[in-house]
């Protein structure tokens, strides 16, 4: 029995790295019956092209679904597309929910001479304890520092489409991932990364390239839980007059009293996330039972299915015959 790590998943095939080799495997039928979800980053035991066991995880995240990671690097563009603070705060809050160390990287610095944006970034996020770096994958600016934060860790790179994740990976890895320009019509990037995939930088450093996504919502938490995702709000959380204060229209709200010390854009993001969480509250009210883990249990439903027509012809013939016995066991 061999042990290895899933570095890529495509359709029903799982690509496992073990002792310097790559193995294409399928999931043993008994694991399918148990409805065990296997993620990129999972360590597994496998034999004869079949995954027999999923080993315990130290952590995992969803949207994107990745296991056994050390840190999240949030990539934003200074320009093209323009920096969106609400999108940035969304990623930060999501990483906070998963209790992961978070680094903020602002790419495409060569496209903007707006010092006010840079000053605003440092003013908001440096007091919150974030490591912040500015890069230009095109000009090589900040790449050495970017590479240094990845050393000895498994890092998930996340961010909206078009911010330059693939270009940064190309700059530090020497590989050549496909990149595309931001659309002039929409001002948004296109999805050059289609699936989560682990990329080795060296023996101890790996990055997880993830698809750009814009549909991340806080529709899996109750509104009262949202303020716990904002570090600067936590000291004032218990000082409001009302225990169930949402910090919106209530009187004697300690958090509203500190707007200014709490950045306005951060507070606006908080309000947006509370509105999204109200959808979950309505669902809980309708069902009558609060399910704390509903997000983790149902995230499979948001997975995008790969069209059967996209499969290589070999997978419709030879490989399906090879793995038929595995599926039936």
Tell me what each language-model feature is:
Residues 70-76, 97-109, 129-135:
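Conserved beta-strand/loop subsegment of P-loop NTPase cores
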Residues 1-10:
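Structural detector for short beta-strands of small beta-barrel domains
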Residues 86-97:
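Histidine-anchored nucleotide/phosphate-binding helix
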Residues 111-163:
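Canonical P-loop GTPase G-domain recognition
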Residues 22-37:
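Beta-strand/loop nucleic-acid-binding surfaces
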Residues 12-16:
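Short aromatic-glycine-enriched beta-strand elements
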Residues 35-40, 47-49, 56-60, 64-65, ...:
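Helix-rich effector regions associated with P-loop NTPase G domains
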């Amino acid at each position: 029995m061999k042990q290895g790590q899933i570095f890529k998943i495509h359709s029903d095939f799982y690509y496992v790295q073990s002792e310097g080799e790559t193995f294409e495997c399928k999931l043993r039928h008994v694991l399918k019956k148990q409805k065990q979800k296997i993620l990129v980053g999972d360590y597994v035991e496998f034999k004869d092209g079949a995954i027999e066991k999923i080993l315990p995880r130290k952590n995992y995240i969803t949207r994107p679904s990745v296991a056994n990671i050390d840190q999240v690097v949030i990539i934003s563009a200074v320009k093209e597309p323009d920096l969106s603070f609400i999108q940035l705060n969304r990623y930060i809050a999501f990483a906070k929910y998963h209790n992961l160390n978070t680094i903020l990287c602002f790419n495409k610095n060569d496209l903007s001479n707006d010092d006010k944006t840079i000053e605003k970034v440092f003013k908001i996020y440096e007091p919150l304890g974030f490591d912040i770096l500015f890069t230009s994958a095109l000009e090589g600016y900040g790449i050495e520092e970017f590479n240094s934060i990845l050393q000895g860790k498994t890092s998930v790179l996340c961010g909206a489409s078009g911010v330059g994740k693939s270009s940064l990976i190309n700059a530090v890895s020497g590989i050549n991932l496909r990149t595309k320009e931001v659309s002039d019509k929409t001002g948004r990037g296109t999805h050059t990364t289609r699936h989560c995939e682990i990329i080795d930088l060296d023996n101890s450093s790996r990055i997880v390239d993830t698809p750009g996504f814009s549909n991340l919502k806080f529709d899996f938490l109750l509104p009262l839980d949202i303020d716990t995702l904002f570090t600067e709000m936590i000291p004032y959380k218990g000082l409001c007059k009302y225990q169930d204060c949402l910090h919106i229209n209530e009187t004697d709200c300690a958090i509203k009293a500190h707007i200014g010390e709490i950045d306005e854009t951060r507070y606006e993001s908080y309000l947006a996330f509370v509105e999204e969480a109200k959808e979950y509250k309505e669902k809980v009210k309708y069902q009558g039972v609060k399910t704390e883990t509903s997000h983790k249990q149902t995230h499979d439903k948001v997975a995008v299915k790969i069209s059967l027509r996209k499969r290589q012809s070999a997978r419709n013939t030879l490989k399906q015959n090879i793995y038929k016995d595995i599926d039936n066991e």
